[in-house]
């Protein structure tokens, strides 16, 4: 797998937005030309569903085991890989911004292994 493509519609919630954009040669990479989903905070690009983003997460996804803590929901790219990993017992995602949750969570794959908490990671205390 070279890319985890998300199925999140365009939208705005507070200072966050999801946009579909056509890209060619993204950030000077050999990214295939096509439409990509991008999460923005104000006008700052936070995350996209590109092969580059997947490569940045690949080692973590391959090595994950036990009870996994994910700091930030982003586009929810890691959810499906983690929940389908037989070495992962549970996935706890801590997302600081309710606006990101409102835009993304309903469109993410999830099962009984995955739970989402709205909190700043440094303020959150595990059960």
Predicted features along the sequence, with ranges:
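Class I S-adenosylmethionine
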Residues: 1-67
